[in-house]
Amino acid sequence: NDVAVLTVDPPIVYSAAISPVCLPPFNNAADQFVGKDGAVMGWGRLESGGVQPNALRQATVQIIPNADCNAQYGVGTIFKQQLCASAPGKDTCQGDDGGPIVVQAKADSTAWTQIGISSFGIGCANPDFAGVYASVAFFRKWIDTYMKN
C-alpha cells in the first residue's frame, strides 16, 4: 500500500524553508477530495522510459472519482484506500512512486495537506489512465498507531 513511517534522529529543525506537511483526518470515503487540484512532485522520469531530471519537478493534477478511475483500469482494480488524479500531459512517472500528492489546506493558505502517496499508473501522462495514489486519510489510523510508537 506504499505507506511507511520513518523516525528521524536528530529531529528536523523547521524554518522558513522547511515546514511539515499536514495529514488529513481518518476517513475511509474514497471520493472526499474529488475536484480538488493536487500538486505532485518528484525526481522521476520526465516521460515513460525517459531520462530523470536534474531538479525536483512538480505538476498540478485534478482528483477524479474512483468510479471514473475504475472505468479506466477495469472494475475492481481501484479500491477505497486509493485515489486517482489526472491532467492533460501531466502525471507522476517511474521514480516518483512513494512521493506525495498534496492539496492546499485552505484556498488562501500556505499550509498543504498530503492526501496521497504515488502508487502506480500505466505509462506516464497517459490520457487513458489516471495516476493512482494510496489514500493517506484511509491509512491515518495506521499511521497514528506507528507514530505513537
Residue ranges and their predicted role:
Residues 1-149:
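Extracellular "complement/coagulation-type" protease architecture
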